[in-house]
Amino acid sequence: TGVAWRIT
């Protein structure tokens, strides 16, 4: 995916 940076 490409949304794992806003879940951090």
UniProtKB/Swiss-Prot annotation:
Keywords: Antimicrobial, Fruiting body, Fungicide, Glycoprotein, Hemagglutinin, Lectin
Domain of life: Eukaryota
UniProt pH dependence: Hemagglutinating activity is stable from pH 4 to pH 9 but drops sharply below pH 4 and above pH 9.
Activity under varying temperature: Hemagglutinating activity is stable below 60 degrees Celsius but drops sharply to about 20% at 80 degrees Celsius.
PTM remark: Glycosylated.
MF terms (GO), sorted A to Z: carbohydrate binding
Glycoprotein among keywords: yes
GO biological process, one term: killing of cells of another organism
The protein's role, per its UniProt record: Has metal-independent hemagglutinating activity against erythrocytes from human, sheep, goat, rat, rabbit and chicken. Hemagglutinating activity is inhibited by glycoproteins fetuin, asialo-fetuin, fibrinogen, asialo-fibrinogen, thyroglobulin, bovine (BSM) as well as porcine submaxillary mucin and asialo-BSM but not by sugars alpha-L-fucose, D-glucose, D-galactose, D-glucosamine, D-galactosamine, lactose, D-melibiose, D/L-mannose, D-mannosamine, D-raffinose, L-rhamnose, xylose, glacaturonic acid or N-acetylglucosamine.
Oligomer status and interactors: Monomer.
Name recorded for this polypeptide: Lectin
Organism: Ganoderma lucidum (Ling zhi medicinal fungus)
